[in-house]
């Protein structure tokens, strides 16, 4: 009786996994954060994305997932200096077996981002991020990607980072818990946090 019950339970579990897998397919990506190259024209390529060339729409196809879109507002003392970024956020990606997040910045002029900010129904000086509707985001899906931020769910640690990327050209101590390592030739900045996941920022 117990054996029959266990077999039935295993069959039901397998069916549930199959159904969930169809609704939320998990795509395995073989990219690694140290797999960085340059095109003949000097554009940086990482995670299958060529900065300044690959579009947001193309990244959605290659990553096999629909991102969340956020408009980030960087407040300063002067509204003239206020800056904005439109970011596509891909959560729960599986990259080389590691649950990860990719944040792709749209390559858009500040005047366009300012217009997008002005069109928001509600705004607050204290708020730093705003969710953007799929309809509004679709209007900018042909924009190229300006930068990539890779946030793994694990910390690689300084030793592995040096093994993979080499010694940083410049190291800065931001605070007691944050360090910044710079690899300008690679177009890479690594932020090492004592209490959070590392951040790998790729720019041209």
Locate predicted features:
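A cross-family detector of function-defining hotspots
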Residues: 22-31, 55-204
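Acidic/histidine-rich, surface-exposed loop or edge segments in extracytoplasmic proteins
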Residues: 36-47, 137-146
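Extended non-catalytic domains of envelope/secretory-pathway proteins
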Residues: 5, 30-31, 35-39
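Hydrophobic membrane-insertion alpha-helices, especially the h-region
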Residues: 3-23
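Core segments of small alpha/beta cavity-forming domains
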Residues: 43, 47-60
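Generic structural "secondary-structure junction" signal
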Residues: 36, 48-51, 71, 150
């Amino acid at each position: 009786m117990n054996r029959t019950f266990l077999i039935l339970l295993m069959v039901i579990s397998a069916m549930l996994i199959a159904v969930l897998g169809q609704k939320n397919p998990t795509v395995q990506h073989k990219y690694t954060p140290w797999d960085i190259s340059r095109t003949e024209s000097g554009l940086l390529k990482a995670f299958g994305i060529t900065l300044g060339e690959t579009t947001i729409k193309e990244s959605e196809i290659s990553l096999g997932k629909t991102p969340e879109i956020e408009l980030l507002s960087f407040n300063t003392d002067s509204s003239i200096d206020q800056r904005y970024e439109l970011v596509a956020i891909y959560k729960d990606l599986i990259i080389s077996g590691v649950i990860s997040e990719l944040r792709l910045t749209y390559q858009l002029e500040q005047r366009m981002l300012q217009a997008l900010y002005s069109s928001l129904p509600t705004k607050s000086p204290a708020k730093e991020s705003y969710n953007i509707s799929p309809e509004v985001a679709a209007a900018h899906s042909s924009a190229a990607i300006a930068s990539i931020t890779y946030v793994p769910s694990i910390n690689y640690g300084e030793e592995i980072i040096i093994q993979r990327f080499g010694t940083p050209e410049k190291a800065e101590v931001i605070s007691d818990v944050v360090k910044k390592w710079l690899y300008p030739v690679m177009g890479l900045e690594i932020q090492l946090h004592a209490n959070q996941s590392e951040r790998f920022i790729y720019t041209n």
